[in-house]
Amino acid sequence: MNFDSSPIAAIATAPGRGGIGVVRVSGKNISSIIEAVCATKGAELQPRHATFTNFVNADGSVIDQGLAIYFKAPHSYTGEDVLELQGHGGPIVLQMLLTRCLEAGTDIGLRMAQPGEFTHRAFLNDKLDLAQAEGVIDLIEASTEAAAKSASQSLSGAFSKTIQDLVDKITNLRMLVEATLDFPEEEIDFLEKSDARGQLNGIREALQAVFTQASQGALLRDGLNIVLAGQPNVGKSSLLNALAGSDVAIVTAIAGTTRDKVIETIQIEGIPVNVIDTAGIRDASDATDEVERIGIERTWAAVKTADVIIHMLDANRGPTRADEQIVERFPENIPVMRIWNKIDLSGHRPAIDRMPDSTHIYVSATDLQGMDLLRGELLRLIGWQQTGESLYLARERHLVALKSAHDHLEMAAQHAAHDSEATDPALDLFAEELRLAQERLSSITGEFTSDDLLGVIFSRFCIGK
């Protein structure tokens, strides 16, 4: 995203009708817009005070009435002068007010904001770092209470502070290494007297703890896609209804009732889970019509995109050759849980049986026996841990950076393991790996970040944020 410092304006509230709508303006020399749009009868707006006023056209006709709030730089969201006009939340009146602001700001070059540009300016003006900026959009998009709490942690700077603490520790260790390299004549045994290995091990342990928390937080953000697959009439739709707690899928005794995907989003321990019910799988030649055949094709397409496959089986009937053929087509890289349904008919009790290659759980979707076992095993399978600690709503780029930093620290540990003189090349390599680890961690908060990445991140925001 190329930075254009011209003043910007946008509607800051969500599209649609509401009780209140906000038009936001940010940039230099916006006092002319205040004078032109706000009928304050000569009184100046006091910074950070709400002033009730009419919003007017150039001819003095009233567009709307509401509150005008002026934030003087640097005490604003963007770090620039900001004007917020809070009026009624109708889309037409808000568009009229925005158009009036753009007309009044022609002389100062006022233009429409790009997606995420207000937050981008906040980042450039050091009002927040990159991880906090991502926390803004994660908080807006949070689909569960747990995800919202974790996003709030990132927005408040908790994640950034943790990363900065790691960076500071690596920096201190680098300073000792560089000093030893610069003054070899002192003949200091750096690795022993500065306890470099001990410091490095402490950093590695701290980084691993952060990675664990971030990985858990990523589950809260990205959620999980679970596909229910199996032969017709084994209870896939009944299981979807049991997990959802309502009748979201049609259930009948007729095999092949489900003809297309049915998707329902639920929560398990605060993790958003997309449960995808699919058409029953059987040989295409046995399909009753073209619609069922297409439904079976879509089932296999859904299976390929799953994070976890739940293979539904009939506990009352037992395993069949058709079940084995279905298993043979499952992708090898996707974990599979085998759920034996209808234990209310078979005489089985709710149970879980973990085998080397798969997990078998016995349930009844109609009377909900074994459902807690199923939910718990799903969490275990995806690596969810109840740590009791605050989680960071990490993104994929955060996890990649943390993993890369970990790898560089591992290489540094290997170089530090050599019993060598201070001037040995291994110490140079030790210092370089520390530098690279520090750089990877700093990319999380935006200290070392390419313009291309910034453009991608902020383009995902809404226009007025």
UniProtKB/Swiss-Prot annotation:
Instruction: Summarize the subunit comment.
Output: Homodimer. Heterotetramer of two MnmE and two MnmG subunits.
Q: What is this protein called?
A: tRNA modification GTPase MnmE
Q: What top-level class of enzyme does the UniProt entry assign?
A: hydrolase
Q: Which PANTHER family match?
A: TRNA MODIFICATION GTPASE GTPBP3, TRNA MODIFICATION GTPASE GTPBP3, MITOCHONDRIAL
Organism superkingdom: Bacteria
Enumerate the HAMAP family for this protein.
GTPase_MnmE
EC number(s): the record gives 3.6.-.-
Query: What parts of the sequence cross the membrane?
Result: none
Which CDD domains would you find in this protein's record?
A: trmE, TrmE_N
Details of cofactor binding:
Binds 1 potassium ion per subunit.
Any idea which positions bind GTP? 233-238, 252-258, 277-280
The answer on whether this UniProt entry bears the keyword GTP-binding reads: yes
Record-stated family: Belongs to the TRAFAC class TrmE-Era-EngA-EngB-Septin-like GTPase superfamily. TrmE GTPase family.
Question: Would I find Transmembrane helix among this entry's keywords?
Answer: no
